[in-house]
């Protein structure tokens, strides 16, 4: 059993993942499509919202415990080219070992749109905090890095939005069972972004259209 299998229920119940301006934006951007693939679906929140909007959705995730329709990594999607009108990936790219390969693979199986949401790189302190909380965190990327990456993977960047999200700090630590000295160090590292117990996270949503 992987660490993600152990965390699956916490992510299904997570308010951070089940709501937010970026989730609403993804659903809006996908409007009019009939089919979608949600990559690294996690708790399944994007897939659920797209199904509620009337799309036929397939979900994928590398962790069996996430209960996705297909178990596979983002870098190796077992689908033919242009299999889905829309491909989505929300709050997962910072875990990808090769984000460019994963983005190119998601673009390959999309016929029209690739929609990505992820947290933005803020500072070295922020990255240290993320690694302490979750060793599977590879890195966050800057807005400029994302804006450069999509055109390099066969997509025209049609739109992007940057905004912030404030989440409860302690549940964020509890979700990955981070306690003791690691939790204390994380609190120190992110102290300048915490107000009234809520952590500010900067986030980007990107809409890439297949060429």
Sequence positions of predicted segments:
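Conserved class I S-adenosyl-L-methionine
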Residues: 1-32, 45-49, 170-174
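Conserved Class I S-adenosyl-L-methionine
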Residues: 43-45, 158-211
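A conserved beta-strand element that flanks and buttresses the S-adenosyl-L-methionine
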Residues: 88
